[in-house]
A protein has these predicted regions:
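Conserved active-site tyrosine of GNAT-family acetyltransferases
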Residues: 73, 78, 100
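Short glycine/proline-centered loop/turn elements that form peptide/ligand docking sites
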Residues: 38, 42, 65-69, 86-91
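Conserved acetyl-CoA-binding loop-helix of GNAT-fold acetyltransferases
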Residues: 28, 34-48, 70-75
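Conserved GNAT acetyl-CoA-binding A-motif
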Residues: 51-61
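Conserved catalytic-core motifs of GNAT/GCN5-like acyltransferases
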Residues: 59-62, 79-96
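Glycine-rich acetyl-CoA-binding "A-motif" of GNAT/NAT acetyltransferases
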Residues: 4-8, 68, 94
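Acetyl-CoA-dependent GNAT
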Residues: 1-31, 103-107
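Terminal substrate-recognition subdomain of acyl/acetyltransferases
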Residues: 93-109
């Protein structure tokens, strides 16, 4: 039923071909949340980063309170490397973020 509709965006940014790492970002429209689109898109982007772009490491930043996103990232093998205090500003206050990453050698599809 959602065919041919834009449900969100996934992108690889800050691509560094020397150090072979990049940042991954994903946003799914709220009305499509919980339907598996985030996991599907995330898997495809990870495969592209590792197999086509030959990245060694993919990383991301996530709101420390976003348990749903953290669960998806952990299910894909991402591990928390650190907590960044008051990393971003939203809705009138600063929020903490986790820095998470996945190494190609640790990725299992």
């Amino acid at each position: 039923e959602d065919e041919n509709q834009v449900v969100g965006i996934v992108e690889l940014v800050e691509i560094n071909y020397i150090h072979r790492n990049c940042e991954i970002q994903i946003i799914i429209k709220p009305e499509f949340s919980g339907k598996g689109y985030a996991k599907f898109a995330f898997e495809k982007a990870i495969i592209y980063a590792f197999d086509i772009l030959n990245m060694h490491k993919i990383y991301l930043y996530v709101d420390a309170d976003n348990k749903k996103a953290i669960h998806i990232y952990e299910s894909q093998g991402f591990k928390t490397e650190g907590l960044l205090k008051e990393q971003f500003y939203t809705k009138g206050k600063y929020k903490d973020a986790y820095f998470m990453s996945l190494l190609k050698s640790e990725y299992i599809l």
